[in-house]
């Protein structure tokens, strides 16, 4: 079978909701929602190999450490493993006083009863129940009419309320999900939820959670936002319910749907870290939270060490996080492109540590989430001088002058083309050493002595060449002019730069010099030494030897 030429014969667009006065497009997210992690339930049930008790406990503690205050810990009526885990959390005293666990149950009395058994002794808990409301599920799966669906929700609600009243030692909260909400007629979704509201009689002090799942993502995010706004306008006792979002990523827009849903009036978000979950996954709580953070909104979740969180999630889920995954992937803060690298390097050089973040191509400061700057710029055959310069500055304190950046980038480009691989900062520095710092032929500096008197410098240098030691002497207005006068070749200094590497007693000096030999094209040299004069002399020898070597190659 192949793709259809006319897919409308098989698929139809989801109907839009008519809200001519919709308000969500002009809204902004200005505060964090209530967050619930479903990693231990929705995430866990989607794994090839579900977590054992030890992994679940490790994951739970990580969620608490991140700052999650509501955590769905399992489906205890459907799994003995989940039941035992809930008991261990409660009996082992693992639940902090400010954290509420949530469990899921189907709308059946035996399963609800088993659920309450699992929660015995909990200080506080949310009982979350659901039944499917979408037309296709009513017709195909359950053969139920609308009245039958409402009756299921109401009957289950009454059982839950009764069992809660029989166990007053726990501070109970309740959540209802019209499953497949995003494919349910809006009027019917409100009708079912209003019937549930009548059962629980919520108040502004004791709110009922109405969770509105895009169980299967069926439309563009703006349609989901319209559904949420319409629901918020028409539901009874809006001040006594928390409207919760539970999006999936079947169309790849779970994050966008969640953000627009919050703009449309929702109060709460359910999801999983890094988007684990059924099929294409639940919404990624990390991405939603850090999207808020980069807009200046405190998400009230702490991802200061995002790689440690990722390590736990990968090991417990036995699934890798994609290298391009927002914020946490190995490559998301990495630039290979030369123009991108140049912009990033300039951004870092001008960034005010206490000012607004304005580094191009980086929507977040990697340091805020525990990332180093080492991986921000990586060099391959697509890279330019900006990336090379950045790595040398960050890792070795080497600040190449602009024209030298261009010259050395050609050296690196030639090497990356030869290797066909990425080059690390260490490899780039080794190339710099080989090209400039080890340019000791045909003349190797063995030593020098400088005398200065009345504004005149006299320099004596000891040089090794062709197995012999020779001496040069020159006089000039400064050490470099004196050295140029001593050289056996006609050398013209075009440019000179110097700076310190490091600080304090261990600091070294770096000198960069650009010379022209016999009127040929300019070339550069580098010298590094504890003494700035020695560094300058080494730089001149480096440039001279490189120029002589290239002249010899050209003649050959």
UniProtKB/Swiss-Prot annotation:
Its cofactor is Mg(2+). Mg(2+) binds at residues 42, 246, 248, 282. PROSITE patterns: AIPM_HOMOCIT_SYNTH_1, AIPM_HOMOCIT_SYNTH_2, PYR_CT. Keywords: Amino-acid biosynthesis, Branched-chain amino acid biosynthesis, Cytoplasm, Leucine biosynthesis, Magnesium, Metal-binding, Transferase. Its EC number is 2.3.3.13. Residues 33-307 form the Pyruvate carboxyltransferase domain. Pfam families: HMGL-like (PF00682), IPMS_D2 (PF22615), LeuA_dimer (PF08502). One of its GO terms (molecular function) is 2-isopropylmalate synthase activity. Residues 439-556 are annotated as: Regulatory domain. It catalyses: 3-methyl-2-oxobutanoate + acetyl-CoA + H2O = (2S)-2-isopropylmalate + CoA + H(+). InterPro entries: 2-isopropylmalate_synth_dimer, AIPM/Hcit_synth_CS, Aldolase_TIM, IPM_Synthase, LeuA-like_post-cat, LeuA_allosteric_dom_sf, LeuA_N_DRE-TIM, PYR_CT. Pathway: Amino-acid biosynthesis; L-leucine biosynthesis; L-leucine from 3-methyl-2-oxobutanoate: step 1/4. One of its GO terms (cellular component) is cytoplasm. It is found in: Cytoplasm. GO terms for biological process: L-leucine biosynthetic process. PANTHER family: 2-ISOPROPYLMALATE SYNTHASE, PTHR46911. Homodimer. NCBIfam families: leuA_yeast, PRK03739.1. Catalyzes the condensation of the acetyl group of acetyl-CoA with 3-methyl-2-oxobutanoate (2-ketoisovalerate) to form 3-carboxy-3-hydroxy-4-methylpentanoate (2-isopropylmalate). Belongs to the alpha-IPM synthase/homocitrate synthase family. LeuA type 2 subfamily. This is 2-isopropylmalate synthase. The gene is leuA.
């Amino acid at each position: 079978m192949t793709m259809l030429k006319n897919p409308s014969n098989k698929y139809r667009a989801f109907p839009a909701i008519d809200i001519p006065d919709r308000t969500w497009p002009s809204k902004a997210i200005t505060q964090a929602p209530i967050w619930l992690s479903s990693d231990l339930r929705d995430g866990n049930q989607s794994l090839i190999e579900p977590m054992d008790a030890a992994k679940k406990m490790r994951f739970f503690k990580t969620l608490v450490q991140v700052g999650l205050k509501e955590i769905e810990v399992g489906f205890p009526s459907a799994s003995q493993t989940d039941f035992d885990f809930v008991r261990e959390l409660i009996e082992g005293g693992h639940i902090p006083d400010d954290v509420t666990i949530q469990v899921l149950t189907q709308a059946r009395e035996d399963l609800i009863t088993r659920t309450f058994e699992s929660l015995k002794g909990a200080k506080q808990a949310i009982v979350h129940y659901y039944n499917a409301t979408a037309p296709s599920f009513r017709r195909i799966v359950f053969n139920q009419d609308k009245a039958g669906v409402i009756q299921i929700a109401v009957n289950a609600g009454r059982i839950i309320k009764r069992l809660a009243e029989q166990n007053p030692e726990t501070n109970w909260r309740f959540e209802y999900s019209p499953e497949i909400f995003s494919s349910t007629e809006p009027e019917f979704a409100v009708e079912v939820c209003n019937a549930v509201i009548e059962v629980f009689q919520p108040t502004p002090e004791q709110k009922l959670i109405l969770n509105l799942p895009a169980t299967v993502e069926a439309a563009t995010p703006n349609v989901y936002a319209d559904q949420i706004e319409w629901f918020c306008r028409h539901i009874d006792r809006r001040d006594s319910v928390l409207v919760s979002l539970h999006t999936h990523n079947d169309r790849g827009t779970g994050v966008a749907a969640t953000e627009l849903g919050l703009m449309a009036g929702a109060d709460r978000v359910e999801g999983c870290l890094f988007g684990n979950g059924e099929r294409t996954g639940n919404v990624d709580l990390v991405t939603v939270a850090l999207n808020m953070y980069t807009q200046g909104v405190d998400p009230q979740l702490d991802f200061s060490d995002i790689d440690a969180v990722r390590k736990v999630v990968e090991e417990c889920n036995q699934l890798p996080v994609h290298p391009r995954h927002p914020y946490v992937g190995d490559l998301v803060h990495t630039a290979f492109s030369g123009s991108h690298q140049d912009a990033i390097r300039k951004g870092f050089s001008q960034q005010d540590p206490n000012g607004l973040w304005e580094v191009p191509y980086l929507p977040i400061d990697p340091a805020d989430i525990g990332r180093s700057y080492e991986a921000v710029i990586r060099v391959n055959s697509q890279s330019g001088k900006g990336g090379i310069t950045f790595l040398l500055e960050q890792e070795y304190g080497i600040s190449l002058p602009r024209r030298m950046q261009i010259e050395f980038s050609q050296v690196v480009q030639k090497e990356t083309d030869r290797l066909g691989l990425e080059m690390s900062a260490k490899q780039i520095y080794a190339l710099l050493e080989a090209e400039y710092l080890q340019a000791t032929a045909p003349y190797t500096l063995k030593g020098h002595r400088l005398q200065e008197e009345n504004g005149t410098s006299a320099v004596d240098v000891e040089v090794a060449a062709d197995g012999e030691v020779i001496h040069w002497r020159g006089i000039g207005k400064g050490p470099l002019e004196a050295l140029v006068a001593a050289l056996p070749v006609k050398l013209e200094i075009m440019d000179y730069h110097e700076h310190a590497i490091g600080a304090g007693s261990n600091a070294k000096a770096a000198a960069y010099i650009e010379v022209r030999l016999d009127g040929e094209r300019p070339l550069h040299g580098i010298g590094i030494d504890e003494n700035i004069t020695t560094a300058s002399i080494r730089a001149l020898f480096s440039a001279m030897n490189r120029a002589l070597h290239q002249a010899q190659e050209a003649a050959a």
